Amino acid sequence: MDPTHQSFRLYAEVLVSANINKILDYGIPAELEDRVTIGSVVKVPLQRKVTNDKYKFAIVLKIKDSSDFANVIQPIAGISYEGVTLPKDLIDLIFWISQYYFCPLGSTLSLFLPTVYSQTHSTKHQNNVFLGQNAERTQEIIKSIEDPHQIAVLRKLLKTTKPLTPKELIKKTDISTKILDSLSKQGFIRIVDSANLEIQDEQLQYFLPEPPTLTQEQIEAINTISQSLITTKFQTCLLFGVTGSGKTEVYLQVIRKARSLGKSVILLVPEVALTIQTLSFFKMHFGAEVGVLHYKLSESERTQTWHKAARGLINIIIGPRSAIFCPMQNLGLIIVDEEHDGAYKQSDLPPFYQARDVAVMRGKFTNATVILGSATPSLESYTNALSKKYTLSVLSKRASTSIPTKVSLIDMNREMEKTRKKILFSPTVIRSIEQRLAVGEQTIIFFNRRGFHTNVSCSSCKYTLKCPHCDMILTFHKTERILLCHLCNTRLSKPITSCPQCHGTMTLQYRGAGTEKIEALLQDFFPTVRTIRLDSDTTRYRGSHDALIKQFATGKADILIGTQMIAKGMHFPAVTLSVVLSGDSGLYIPDFRAAEQVFQLITQVTGRSGRSYLPGEVLIQTFLPQNSTISHALAQDFPAFYKEEILGRKACNYPPFTRLIRCIFLGKCAEYTLQEAQRMHELIKQNLDAQASLMDISPCGHFKVKDLFHYQFLIKTRNILTVNKQLQDAFSAAKLSSKVRCIVDIDPITTFF
């Protein structure tokens, strides 16, 4: 029968996972009437004739017995997730996110469905080779076999501190794939899809601590949060605890309390990288009740966990920001660990939500207790706690097993005067690393630039090589022998023979340093040192981050070198030295959050040292030893930093005293993009609420990215929803050219890049 003439007894109002901002009516076929309920996930057509792979996912919002479009209505094609319905708190959250973050309802819905979300987030797969037996047994195997190629492979794996792909191992040992196949069949090696490292329990073994004796501050925090759980009233608690103060132990105890009350739990961590270490700890205590959810899982893994949580078979979900959208039965507790972290802000695809704030709103919709934990709270959260909007629990001392860490500042101006040249490592740092190597203790070195050389120029005219598609200087990556753009990933692997500026024969000069060079220098200083480098180059494949962390945690390397990802919640009991090579680099960025982010980063890095019975030391190298942000970070004095920073925020009317809306215009023609931005700016100026203020248009910090030019302006307001409505009216009136795209970012974490 032609669906345009089909009649139905019942109709459903549904929200479709497409880039549309309205609710549509569909007919409910007779065979689905008993199975479709409010919150059901269904499949619907958006066009008259569709194939099975063209159906869209949708959520049923309302069931009714009539429709204004009954004559042309199409039927629901089927139920996608049988027996699973989205709870009311999630449906309310969809509408709130859409309104607040200025995003169509259909695009917002994609966050909440596992299949749709996984289709928009892809990742790379890679196999890694591991020993099939422990080191002692492998040594015995080497003595028992005669094939020199097999022996070479096993010896290489015994020595390596980094996961190797089959291709890398074949190249390093000069063997064929048959050798690897033979060793694998005998059980002497394992060839594992790196993705599986994230879900195999046997891979989740780290140093397991003895149950600690709780401090009085921990007991008070646990009691405060437990009382909130018992009353079943929405409450947000800021758990402000210095690094090593035992916030995780507080999480453990309140999760136990929530489970004893029959309530489920969501625990957010900033990045997938932290999920495995956190999962290991909580699986040890709660076993099969715990599930992990993030975009790097396969579609089937993600969907399976989502279904189990929706049915109450998993009651504790751990994951990065996307885990906040998991349907849970009787959700009673939401924990946002490292709540200050910028990774909670989605920046790649709309809606550009802040998961910390979404967590608070979900807690409100479901009457749950929300914990925001950090050693360096965001200024917004700390202000909310001081104003009593949130309750405040403070852990001011390190846990009883921790010895206070010694923190020292190294003035690199003086070091350069002594050496009369630029140096990356001061003598003090070299001596301190040497002392750790001598006694078998570990060191973490933080340097927030990747690659080998960060500046490559013509030796004749000094022209610096830039990306042809962006206004970004190219970085030399020695491992791959390429020049790489860190904005658009353009790779130049062929030698450059003539200078684009002077057209002379190109002789390159290399300057600047990244983590690759830091690793190379350390190996020059200490030829026998075992290093692991942790940055986006070494962790691009699924599971590679976890494999590297496991190697370091089990003592297979002496020094961990990395970018900001090493600052986030890692727990390594054998680390007694943390080094910040360039403590002031982030302060040169013209962004209102720059000082806050530098303070947070230095404080978090220093917290990686001395987390067990061994005394820790932190060394911070800087060219700005008198800078107050660095001084406060050196003293680990967040209240003093807050007191100073909040004065500047208030004087300039920046968050937390207002909220920001950032409108970014992108187009291939710089002049035309600016014209459209000016036209939109004028329309908004005419209609803007008197309580809001409109800032001038300016080029973005990265003006050209992927051949698109970027302009922006900011709106300051206390009422986002009101201004969003005025923005929508302005967009409707402006009818922007299809050649220019506008991105609206609510509560941006940066106003520069």
Swiss-Prot record:
GO terms, biological process: DNA recombination; DNA replication initiation; DNA replication, synthesis of primer; double-strand break repair
InterPro entries attached to this UniProt entry: DEAD/DEAH_box_helicase_dom, Helicase_ATP-bd, Helicase_C-like, P-loop_NTPase, PriA, PriA_3primeBD, PriA_3primeBD_sf, PriA_C
Domain Helicase ATP-binding positions: 228-395
Molecular-function GO terms, alphabetical: 3'-5' DNA helicase activity; ATP binding; ATP hydrolysis activity; DNA binding; zinc ion binding
Motif residue range(s): DEAH box: 337-340
EC annotation from Swiss-Prot or TrEMBL: 5.6.2.4
Gene3D superfamilies assigned: P-loop containing nucleotide triphosphate hydrolases, PriA, 3(prime) DNA-binding domain
Transport found in the keyword field: no
Domain of life: Bacteria
Self-association and partners: Component of the replication restart primosome.
Similarity remark: Belongs to the helicase family. PriA subfamily.
Record PANTHER family: PRIMOSOMAL PROTEIN N
Protein name: Replication restart protein PriA
